[in-house]
């Protein structure tokens, strides 16, 4: 109880910082590789099950336009690789393996490949998301990210006067299926890097259709992230994160309690 009160007080003490435009011009392109490892513990029909899921996601990004404190960022996933382990069985996959295209078990993961998604970002928050392929793609990405993906993270757009150690601000983002409340604190500033610690409380409600089965997930928890930005350009260089989510997963009408542990690591490379 005491910990909850302290965390709530920290969020209340923080404030929203007015953002500025990214320092880099429209047309800037970069690649992001994100590795994530999820361990899910669940109990269903009297049986305890542990599922280990590791993913490596390759994405291309482009800063499409900049207007004041608002900018548009487009992205597409070019490759997915990883492994799934459950009940003594392990399966590895790589979207570059041509044989996977005929595997119905991978249909949900592969449908996100090479589909452009456009994000409009204002004051450090995504205010609009659009995809020509519709909401199914966006729902799939939401489920796979477990609330750890923040598309507003790639550019640090604070006023120059705010770039100093201990400066903090908060962002509340309530969207259908995902509600997050994040506290940002600048941990260190050097001539080359700006280190930012992020504490995010997330609540995820999503529905995923996999192999003809409807899977509903209701989870909430906390994610801790460390981001390193280039001090000159304000572009993200790397991110690491750990966290946990708890809740229920509904499969075939049956609720099962789940406990999800998440670790992530991202690296950004200019193109």
Language-model features and meaning:
Residues 1-25:
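Bacterial Sec-dependent N-terminal signal peptides
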Residues 20-271:
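Signature of exported/secreted
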